């Protein structure tokens, strides 16, 4: 099997996604020792998973993360705010018109907002018309209200989507998260009660363009899927894999942190929240190939050491370090007992801290116990110093350390950083250059006659008016009476004199001086 296990095998028996990286391989199972001849020495092939036993290869296609994929998944959309603009005019007695503009809000609908958004992107002329205030009307001594409902569209407004559960995140959402449940969410409420966020694409899941289709070979054993060879020729096992969905696509997270759209017959458990997927950038892809070259180089060094041993017919415990298996799996362990070369079957595991190998001074933990030494020699070049310390030849590749550190530093976060805060709708009454307003039909309301005064002034004016009218009525009546008197005909002076009478001292009525005079003359 070409170039197998370079990356995955190193993690085969490691706990997934811990903070430490593997530094060594040590047998967790080691069989009885048996003497062998020098000619029976063999170098381990670190590019083969010897404990898989999967030899049947079948071509297939699968999806994996794109090389160069950036962690944040941007979803473009727009915000929609329902605004009611009201123009109120009053015309007073002398014809002076006062206009007052007021602004209120209403909750918009998704369909109306999407129609308004289409107006903007298509350049509909109604968009420009809808930006103006409603044209105010006026009537004498009346208050006229003209209202217009508008939809303010601000775009673009970019939010972030979580690749794991397809949730949307932005500072404009309450608590930073869209409250609508994905993937059926077609709008998200915002911190503004009358503003909603709507994705440009009605199906935001289609915007999750982070996958690429690759071709590889499935590795099976007796019909059981146990791994696959990827497009780069690297073998990856499904041991320790867990189920993980990315952007709604089912797949599996392997123990090395990579993701593949592959499902095992024996359904594994779902990944825990701390088991994140590693991004696949160009640096990681380059390191994977360098690791393969490093493992091949180590095998060549082992073969050179084996050639020297066979040629010189001599061996030292230091040279036995070349025969240690560098990746987890089945292999061999070698030691010297009483100057005799000994061999044992072993199953190697990866360790992440030296204290797992040397828990205490003089103790080499192998096979679940402190392994005994023979004249200060353990196995695979590990010895006991005169001071009682366990000395292990450093076999860790710097490239392997670099690769693991890179993997652990390039996980897809569960929450992504905010895109551009400047795209958030700032104030309730702010209409920027990008604003698009939906223009419904205007509504007019004409009130009754209104003098334009407050309530108490209105009644005071009515009372004064009543008193003024009453006084005017009285004055008018008096004037009319005088006028009528002046227009009556004047009586005859003679008749008037005759009608005048006086009363004498005796009490007898005397009609007038003339009659008295006439009467006196007659008597004489």
Curated annotation (Swiss-Prot):
Keywords noted in UniProt: Glycoprotein, Lipoprotein, Membrane, Palmitate, Signal, Transmembrane, Transmembrane helix, Viral envelope protein, Virion
Annotated localization: Virion membrane
Keyword Signal assigned: yes
Transmembrane regions: 460-480
Top-rank lineage group of the source organism: Viruses
Chief site of localization: virion
UniProt key word Signal: yes
Topological region Virion surface: 20-459
A cellular-component GO term for this protein: membrane
Topological category with respect to the lipid bilayer: Single-pass type I membrane protein
Signal peptide as annotated in the record: 1-19
Post-translational modification note: Glycosylated and palmitoylated by host. Glycosylation is crucial for glycoprotein export at the cell surface.
Pfam families named among the record's database cross-references: PH_Rhabdo_glycop (PF24834), Rhabdo_glycop_CD (PF24833), Rhabdo_glycop_FD (PF00974)
Topology Intravirion: residue spans: 481-524
SUPFAM superfamilies noted in UniProt: Viral glycoprotein ectodomain-like
Residue positions bearing lipid (S-palmitoyl cysteine): 480
Record-linked InterPro entries: PH_Rhabdo_glycop (IPR055448), Rhabdo_glycop_CD (IPR055447), Rhabdo_glycop_FD (IPR001903)
Sequence similarity: Belongs to the lyssavirus glycoprotein family.
Other comment: Arg-352 is highly involved in rabies virus pathogenicity. Its mutation dramatically attenuates the virus.
Oligomeric form and interacting partners: Homotrimer. Interacts with matrix protein.
Role noted for this protein: Attaches the virus to host cellular receptor, inducing endocytosis of the virion. In the endosome, the acidic pH induces conformational changes in the glycoprotein trimer, which trigger fusion between virus and cell membrane.
UniProt protein name: Glycoprotein
Organism (species): European bat lyssavirus 1 (strain Bat/Germany/RV9/1968) (EBLV1)
Name of encoding gene: G
